[in-house]
């Protein structure tokens, strides 16, 4: 099976902190993506938000849309409310031929929390995992019926951050919940990305290949820096 690689535009311009790469144009991002040998790109906050505009733009640069991040809130919302909120995003992805949506649950987090100390990020209580898994599975099944599958992104600063939390998530959810396996976030959270992949390779539907500079990571954890502060 041939493997085609895409890249995230955050390499050029940061969605969470627009001042990082804020002056980099969409044309620069897309032309350099193609020049670097990538076949596709994930979404940027700078890209058009309609398939009518984004489709021709990507085609002009000989690229495809791989997927796009969504700030999920299924822990806080019921399924109907979450589905109504995500439907425009899902429609864009389906219109442009994407197979998966990058779904990260940012429940219990407010603006600026990415700068909060790592130790203060939100967590699920032990008794919440079973009901959370059922609700997430039901949402993922609806996504699959719509034509775009869920790729759940474990991410620093969210309720599913550590390898152990990924384990609990996979145990509490059905097969409709695919895993976005992210090496960098596993490392940052103190995990073992190789062992994590071995345990859940059958659920992986999307991959983010990232690294982490050990000296900066050790320093960030020692001083309890926030995720974005560590990035800076």
Model-assigned labels for residue ranges:
Residues 41, 133-232:
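Acidic/histidine-rich catalytic cores of soluble enzymes
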Residues 10-12, 44-46, 70-75, 106-108, ...:
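Active-site beta-loop-alpha junctions enriched in small/polar residues
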Residues 39-45, 64-69, 101-103, 151:
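Short, well-structured secondary-structure segments
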Residues 79-181:
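Active-site acidic/histidine proton-transfer and metal-coordination neighborhood
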Residues 23-27, 48-52, 76-87, 163, ...:
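Structural motif corresponding to alpha-helix initiation and N-cap regions
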Residues 1-18, 66-72, 109-119, 229:
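N-terminal small/glycine-rich loop or linker at the start of catalytic domains
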Residues 8-25, 44, 71-83, 121-130:
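Active-site mouth loops of central-metabolism enzymes
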Residues 1-2, 30-35, 48-67, 84-99, ...:
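Acidic (Asp/Glu)-rich catalytic clusters
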């Amino acid at each position: 099976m041939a493997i085609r690689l895409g890249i995230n535009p955050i390499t050029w311009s940061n969605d969470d902190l627009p001042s990082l790469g804020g002056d980099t144009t969409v044309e620069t991002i897309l032309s350099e993506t193609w020049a670097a040998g990538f076949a596709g790109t994930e979404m940027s906050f700078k890209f058009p938000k309609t398939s009518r505009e984004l489709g021709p733009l990507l085609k002009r640069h000989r690229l495809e849309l791989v997927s796009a991040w969504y700030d999920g809130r299924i822990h806080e919302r019921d399924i109907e409310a979450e589905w109504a909120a995500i439907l425009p995003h899902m429609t864009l992805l389906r219109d442009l031929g994407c197979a998966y949506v990058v779904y990260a649950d940012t429940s219990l987090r407010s603006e600026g929390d990415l700068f909060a100390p790592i130790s203060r990020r939100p967590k699920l209580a032990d008794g919440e995992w079973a009901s959370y898994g059922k609700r997430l599975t039901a949402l993922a099944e609806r996504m699959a019926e719509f034509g775009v599958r869920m790729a759940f992104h474990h991410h620093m600063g969210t309720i599913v951050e550590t390898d152990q939390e990924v384990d609990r998530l996979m145990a509490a959810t059905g097969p409709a919940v695919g895993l976005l396996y992210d090496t960098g976030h596993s490392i940052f959270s103190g995990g073992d990305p190789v062992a994590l992949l071995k345990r859940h390779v059958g659920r992986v539907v999307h991959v983010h290949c990232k690294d982490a500079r050990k000296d900066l990571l050790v320093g960030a954890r020692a001083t309890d820096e926030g995720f974005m502060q560590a990035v800076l």
